[in-house]
C-alpha cells in the first residue's frame, strides 16, 4: 500500500512539474547592474531557448537593441544571469524576453524568434537602479 501511495504521489509531482514547464514566463525585479549583468529570478520555458535582454523605450513596452543573452533549458531555470555587451545607466529600462531556439544550431541569432503566449511576447520589463 505504501509503495502504491508513493508511486501515485510521485506521478502527481511529475505531472505538476510538466504543467509548470509548459508555461512560458519570466520573473525579474528592478535591479542594479552588477558586473555588467542582470539576473532573472526565474525563467520557465516550454522548450530550450534564450533569455534575451533588450534596451527598452521610456515606457518599457518597446524592445530595442539586444544587449545580451543566456541559454535556458526547457523547464524551470532559476537565477538566469545575462552578461551585457554595453553599459546601462541607472533609470534605464530593459526588457527581458524569452526567445525560442528556432533553427537548431544552439546559438542565439536573428532566426531565434520571441516566444508568444496568447498572442503576446513573453517578456518582463525592469528598471536599472
Task: State each model region's role.
Residues 1-10:
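Bacterial N-terminal signal peptides that target proteins for export
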Residues 15-22:
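Sec/Tat signal peptide C-region and signal peptidase I cleavage site
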Residues 22-62:
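Short, surface-exposed binding/anchoring microloops in extracellular/periplasmic proteins
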Residues 39-41, 76-87:
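Exposed aromatic-hydrophobic patches
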Residues 64-75:
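Solvent-exposed serine/threonine-rich low-complexity stretches and specific carbohydrate-binding patches
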Residues 92-101:
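Short, aromatic- and glycine-rich surface loops/edge beta-strands on solvent-exposed regions
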Residues 100-113:
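Short acidic/polar inter-strand loop motif in beta-rich domains
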Residues 118-129:
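Short, low-complexity, Pro/Ser/Thr/Gly-rich segments in the mature regions of secreted, periplasmic
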Amino acid at each position: 500500500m505504501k509503495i502504491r501511495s508513493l508511486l501515485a504521489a510521485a506521478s502527481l509531482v511529475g505531472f505538476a512539474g510538466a504543467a509548470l514547464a509548459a508555461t512560458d514566463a519570466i520573473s525579474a525585479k528592478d535591479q542594479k547592474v552588477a558586473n555588467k549583468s542582470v539576473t532573472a529570478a526565474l525563467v520557465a520555458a516550454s522548450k530550450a531557448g534564450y533569455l534575451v535582454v533588450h534596451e527598452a523605450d521610456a515606457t518599457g513596452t518597446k524592445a530595442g537593441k539586444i544587449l545580451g543573452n543566456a541559454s535556458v533549458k526547457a523547464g524551470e531555470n532559476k537565477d538566469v544571469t545575462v552578461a551585457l555587451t554595453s553599459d546601462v545607466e541607472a533609470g534605464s529600462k530593459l526588457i527581458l524576453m524569452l526567445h525560442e531556439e528556432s533553427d537548431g544550431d544552439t546559438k542565439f541569432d536573428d532566426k531565434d524568434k520571441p516566444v508568444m503566449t496568447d498572442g503576446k511576447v513573453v517578456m518582463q520589463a525592469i528598471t536599472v537602479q
